[in-house]
Amino acid sequence: SSRQREVLQLVAEGKSTKEIASILTVTVKTVEFHKTRIMRELRLRSAAELTKYAISEGLTTIH
């Protein structure tokens, strides 16, 4: 979903769950739900793998 894409991009940028919740004006639980779904769908096991995926898909860049 577009919301999952937003969460993925913010995770890849190094934002914390709390920061993401604040930016998207949702609860921390909602952010955790999206992160869990993304990781399950992509068969990823860590935030590092999530970041690597986001970079490879062009959702974020390394500064």
Q: Model segments located where?
A:
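Hydrophobic residues on short alpha-helical segments
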Residues: 8-12, 39, 51
